[in-house]
């Protein structure tokens, strides 16, 4: 338990350089914790009530970079790389839903002196929802952003094809093909971010080629990406819960969020000109939506 050293290999060094480019100016510190026997990279910044940001599958915590500085002005932000993602190690064995919930529980034990609000995108949303359903006393609130688990995984056909091509052969071309399904205006986003976007793209491709990510997703996809969380389990979520969705999300389409909102009474805020990553694509609108959701947890 606690902080652990990170073994740097020759293969890691180019990725570490790219990671430094990603995090420059974001205003976070990085430390390594051992969580459920998994060495985990955790970004932290700010002061105030704890806010835990959980990214999606095939991603990394630095993708929250456009909203972390604003959130850190009022909250203690905790953004881990999920197991096998980013700079976090692969799990020592098959990692399914139970293992992820144990991992998240240890993250909260080591980083949050009081119950946090969990904000989860995609896979991170499915993990956060299941944790809130089973451990409501350890969570102040829940915000689901394009989350998996509210219905069986059924992306738009073009999205699914691009995702499959990238998974089978991660190259710059297949990466950009997938990114064009993820974002409404990829060229505009790249232009806004400049060199920082180059670091995002380089790091995403490098991490997709690592055995660690494949090992993690092998267990996570069947249990936390593809299936719907049973409605009775979602009914056990008692903490204030909100939904934030991109209007043009092709991965988990808006109808999924609308159905969950109607069934559970969860407020839904929709962000225009955003696909499955509103905090990256429309940070100002996402921050406004998130602050409205956070106000409901007080």
Predicted regions and their residues:
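Conserved HGGG/HGGXW glycine-rich cap/lid loop of the alpha/beta-hydrolase fold
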Residues: 38-87
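Flexible "cap/lid" loop of the alpha/beta hydrolase fold
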Residues: 133, 140-172
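Post-His helix in hydrolase/transferase enzymes
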Residues: 280-292
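Conserved loop-alpha-helix segment in the C-terminal half of the alpha/beta-hydrolase fold
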Residues: 236, 240-274, 280
């Amino acid at each position: 338990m606690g902080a652990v050293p990170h073994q740097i290999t020759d293969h890691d060094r180019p990725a570490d350089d790219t990671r430094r480019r990603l995090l420059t100016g974001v205003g976070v510190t990085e430390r390594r914790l051992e969580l459920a026997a998994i060495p985990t990279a955790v970004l932290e910044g700010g002061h105030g009530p704890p806010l835990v940001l959980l990214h999606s599958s095939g991603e990394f915590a630095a993708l929250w970079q456009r909203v972390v500085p604003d959130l850190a002005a009022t909250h203690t932000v905790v953004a881990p790389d999920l197991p096998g993602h980013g700079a976090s190690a692969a799990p020592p064995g098959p990692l399914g839903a139970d293992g992820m919930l144990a991992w998240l529980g240890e993250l909260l034990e080591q980083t949050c002196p009081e119950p946090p609000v969990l904000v989860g995108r995609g896979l991170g949303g499915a993990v956060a929802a299941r944790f809130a359903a089973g451990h409501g006393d350890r969570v102040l609130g829940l915000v689901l952003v394009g989350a998996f688990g509210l219905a069986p995984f059924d992306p738009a056909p073009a999205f699914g094809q691009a995702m499959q091509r990238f998974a089978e052969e991660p190259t710059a071309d297949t990466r950009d093909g997938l990114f064009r399904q993820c974002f409404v205006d990829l060229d505009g986003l790249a232009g806004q971010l400049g060199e920082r976007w180059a670091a995002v793209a380089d790091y995403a491709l490098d991490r997709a080629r690592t055995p660690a990510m494949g090992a993690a997703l092998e267990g996570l996809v069947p249990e936390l990406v593809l299936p719907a969380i049973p409605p009775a389990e979602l009914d056990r979520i008692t903490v204030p819960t909100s939904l934030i969705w991109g209007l043009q999300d092709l991965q988990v389409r808006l109808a999924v969020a609308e159905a969950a909102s109607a069934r559970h009474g969860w407020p839904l805020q929709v962000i225009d000109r955003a696909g499955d990553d509103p905090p990256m694509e429309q940070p100002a609108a996402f921050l406004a939506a998130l602050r409205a959701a956070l106000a409901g947890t007080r």
